[in-house]
Amino acid sequence: MSVQEHKQEAPDIVRCKVITVSDTRTDETDKSGKLMISFLEEAGHHIAAYEIVKDEKDALQRSVLAGCMDEQTDAVLLNGGTGIADRDVTIEAITPLFSKELPGFGEIFRMLSYTEDIGSAAIMSRATAGVIQHTAVFSTPGSSGAVKLAMNKLIIPELAHVVREIRKDK
């Protein structure tokens, strides 16, 4: 079966939980979370939940697992906490939970960041994606430029296809 045939079998609507990881953002100042939601809604997807979670490993794991275990959620999208500062713990929180990792997401995101956005600073991005409890999980940096790049070039074009692949044998 071709990639196009797989995409045709993918769901039209993906139910998503959006998590902004930040010690400082609020509902009023969370530009990147709102941008992520806007891209998802414009693509016809449904926002099942949205929250802002502090840069704390246990709190992040609880929030991600709650989304992944919710039968009304097909994907969890995080923004923030992917850098190399001590408080950036998103990757440490979610990667141990992955049953499968999608290394191509981070690799291609960094390549696009290098060529189209921030140049050599892309080496500090630890964006990643994987599968937790038959749920797609994507983690992007928290800058609005990074969210826009990830959503436009990678997540929106493949989100439904990824969900289809994860759930086809379930």
UniProtKB/Swiss-Prot annotation:
First and last residue of the signal peptide: none
SUPFAM superfamilies: Molybdenum cofactor biosynthesis proteins
Cellular component aspect of the GO annotation: cytosol
Biological processes, Gene Ontology terms: Mo-molybdopterin cofactor biosynthetic process
Keyword check for Metal-binding: no
Keywords: Molybdenum cofactor biosynthesis
Pathway in which this enzyme or protein is active: Cofactor biosynthesis; molybdopterin biosynthesis
PROSITE patterns named among the record's database cross-references: MOCF_BIOSYNTHESIS_1 (PS01078)
Function, as annotated: May be involved in the biosynthesis of molybdopterin.
Similarity-based family: Belongs to the MoaB/Mog family.
UniProt name for this protein: Molybdenum cofactor biosynthesis protein B
Organism of provenance: Bacillus subtilis (strain 168)
